[in-house]
Amino acid sequence: VGKTNFISFFKLINVIYEQRLHNYTMQNPAERLFHYGLKQTKTLEGYLEFGDNAYEVVLQPRDNGSLFIGKEVSYYRGSGYPVHNIGESNIKDSVIYRDNWLRDYLQSYKIYHFHDTSVGSPLRSSANVNDNRMLSSDGGNLPAYLYALQERAPKTLKRIEAVVRMAIPYFGNFNLAPSIFDSAQINLQWQDVEYSEKYFDANDLSDGSVRFIALATLLLQPNLPKSILIDEPELGLHPAAISLLAGMMKSAADRGCQLIISTQSVGLVNHFEPHDIITVDRKEMQSTFQRLDGSALEHWLEDYSLGELWTKSIINGQPTLR
């Protein structure tokens, strides 16, 4: 209940900041975005705090179903100057000093979703070899980004290969090079650990395997974003791979990256402490968020794992039953 909407809120904030609100709402009209539609909800409001700084935005619908910004405010220690009735955000181009800090925050998080692993999906397709500055949100430039690591940060690539081998025993190593037929394109080629005479590509990997390679690349990259949001990274992963995923997530957090993960995986939850977990429940037609209290669960955790407490409905985060 509401986990994906929480991630989608940050996507919407990014859309607003990047001045793509008009195009976004042409595909996602107000009737779909607003809580129970326009009859129930008249405005969509967001408020984010970053230390002494804050950002507020109020979206209102037009007659054609698109949205405009009814109010936008950047705050510093509670004071701010609102801008009203604009088509796109002013923050990105603002010359106001306080907005420099706000821009840094709004640019600091990246949202990733590696759900689509179908034939012809970005994760299984060739990539432009020059599209390699950062891993794209859908993993579409994965081979180009790995190739850049091979050339610029080979130790990182070796580390990624080592972790991938732990999750995919038949994986030997990557064989990354631009296509001899089109030097601007590159495929995700790899070799089998027991059969090195043939090269394979992303289409020879299972859905879970190609997702795991993307996740390992994301979490082990040398220059992590300040914040990463991932929606259900456990999809299609073997339990052993979920354990490795949890380890990489903790390692990324230790390197100063804030991770916001939505999950339905008991196995993934088992690798974390109560204070790491926020449950989402539906109450009175809306989603409510609550961080677990470790002291309140201390007695239970003597005999049960955190995941077991979840499945036994001892903690929140349960499906809504009618």
Which role does the model predict for each range below?
Residues 7-66:
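Conserved P-loop NTP-binding catalytic core
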Residues 158-220, 227-243:
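Conserved ABC ATPase signature
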